């Protein structure tokens, strides 16, 4: 079985979502996990979640005699990448940065846009952003996207007790 399929099967089987998987130089394998959309109310991935997945993957990769040197498992972070259509559904209403493969002629030949993700309609994705002449809406498909990720929302104000 291919390494990516093996990792995805294991992570999904444990009740998590595989956000991303990377094979880096010198045998480093990076795995990014998150809760499934159904379990999103559980909050953020913890160190304990990463530890649990790491232990399971180490056993599976050893049994399958996978070729790797090191394994890193972590959360996708505040700037979570958006890779699948389900990511755009899940994070509709959130602020995101979207970089397209080609410039959009109807948007001043820009490739990068930052704005609020809209609920996808079929295969069509949308982003509301602030254009040169006020609010604008960009429609695109997943195939048009080079990279996309959430814009981190950090609140440094202290909580009142």
Curated annotation (Swiss-Prot):
CDD domains: YlxS_C. InterPro entries: Ribosome_maturation_RimP, RimP_C, RimP_C_sf, RimP_N, RimP_N_sf. The keyword Cytoplasm applies. One of its GO terms (biological process) is ribosomal small subunit assembly. One of its GO terms (cellular component) is cytosol. Signal peptide: none annotated. The keyword Chloroplast does not apply. Keywords: Cytoplasm, Ribosome biogenesis. It is found in: Cytoplasm. Belongs to the RimP family. HAMAP family: RimP. PANTHER family: RIBOSOME MATURATION FACTOR RIMP. NCBIfam families: PRK00092.2-1. Required for maturation of 30S ribosomal subunits. This is Ribosome maturation factor RimP. It comes from Herminiimonas arsenicoxydans.
């Amino acid at each position: 079985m291919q390494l990516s399929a093996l990792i995805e099967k294991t992570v999904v089987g444990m009740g998590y979502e595989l956000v991303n998987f990377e094979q880096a130089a010198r045998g480093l394998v990076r795995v990014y996990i998150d809760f499934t959309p159904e379990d999103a109310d559980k909050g953020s991935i913890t160190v304990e979640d990463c530890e649990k997945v790491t232990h399971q993957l180490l056993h599976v990769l050893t049994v399958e005699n996978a070729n790797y040197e090191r394994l890193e498992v972590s959360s996708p972070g505040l700037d979570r990448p958006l890779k699948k259509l389900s990511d755009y559904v899940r994070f509709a209403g959130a602020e995101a940065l979207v970089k397209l493969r080609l410039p959009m002629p109807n948007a001043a030949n820009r490739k990068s846009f930052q704005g609020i993700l809209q609920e996808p309609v079929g295969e069509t994705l949308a982003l509301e952003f602030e254009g040169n002449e006020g609010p604008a809406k960009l429609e695109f498909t997943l195939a048009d996207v080079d990279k996309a990720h959430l814009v981190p929302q950090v609140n440094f104000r202290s909580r009142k007790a």
